[in-house]
Amino acid sequence: MTMPFGYASPEQQVRDKSEYARKGIARGRSVVVLTYENGILFVAENPSATLHKISEIYDRIAFAAVGKYNEFENLRTAGIRLMDSRGYMYDRRDVTSRALANAYAQTLGAIFSESVKPYEVEIVVAEVGTSIADDQIYRLTYDGSIADERGFVAIGGASEQVTTSLKEHHRDGQPLAEALRVAVQALTVGVPPGLPQNGERVLAAANLEVGMLDRTRTRRMFKRIVGPALEGLLAQTSAT
């Protein structure tokens, strides 16, 4: 049977889409999500003060992403609307990170299968529980694949290097300052594309976006750490 000019098998199309999405994600600077004694910490290498990679979704749920900003921003806002409507129609306790992760997985899977161009995004959805054992972290990739992560996860271009550092230094129940030190240290190990591979990088507060889900807070547990509060925590990390 003669194939038409320009024909590509389904397997080749999947490979091409995957390669395209991975290359786009690899250009993004990494994000780290890890547990600490009172919740879940989000740390992104992000020099922009307005284009956020980290966001609150609902009371106990937050979101982090790397890749093409307009694509993950569309997913973020859709997730907020979905969780708000679920909480309004049913009960706030029915709003879970698992439901949000499943919705994102279906959306990303459909886009990957049906569209010529896949989304160039990698996402983390996290929910803080009443204890460390109840914390939930889900990682979602461009094709809708979903993974249940324990303790920590890194996404973005240098995620393999960053993950190696997290495996060595993260432990359950770390104080906030220590968890931030572990996260920043891991991000400095991962070198974004286009930067020299030699020499130790230093990440200051101006180059970091930091937020947390704090189980000791009431109702809305997400909080950004900015300005003097972040600088003070970074000073503690450099002193340890």
From Swiss-Prot:
Pfam families: Proteasome (PF00227). One of its GO terms (molecular function) is threonine-type endopeptidase activity. The keyword Cytoplasm applies. GO terms for biological process: modification-dependent protein catabolic process; proteasomal protein catabolic process. It is found in: Cytoplasm. Its main location: cytoplasm. The formation of the proteasomal ATPase ARC-20S proteasome complex, likely via the docking of the C-termini of ARC into the intersubunit pockets in the alpha-rings, may trigger opening of the gate for substrate entry. Interconversion between the open-gate and close-gate conformations leads to a dynamic regulation of the 20S proteasome proteolysis activity. InterPro entries: Ntn_hydrolases_N, Proteasome_alpha, Proteasome_alpha-type, Proteasome_asu_bac, Proteasome_sua/b. Keywords: Cytoplasm, Proteasome. One of its GO terms (cellular component) is proteasome core complex, alpha-subunit complex. Pathway: Protein degradation; proteasomal Pup-dependent pathway. The keyword Cytoplasm applies. HAMAP family: Proteasome_A_B. The 20S proteasome core is composed of 14 alpha and 14 beta subunits that assemble into four stacked heptameric rings, resulting in a barrel-shaped structure. The two inner rings, each composed of seven catalytic beta subunits, are sandwiched by two outer rings, each composed of seven alpha subunits. The catalytic chamber with the active sites is on the inside of the barrel. Has a gated structure, the ends of the cylinder being occluded by the N-termini of the alpha-subunits. Is capped by the proteasome-associated ATPase, ARC. NCBIfam families: 20S_bact_alpha. Component of the proteasome core, a large protease complex with broad specificity involved in protein degradation. Belongs to the peptidase T1A family. This is Proteasome subunit alpha. The lineage of its organism: Bacteria, Bacillati, Actinomycetota, Actinomycetes, Frankiales.
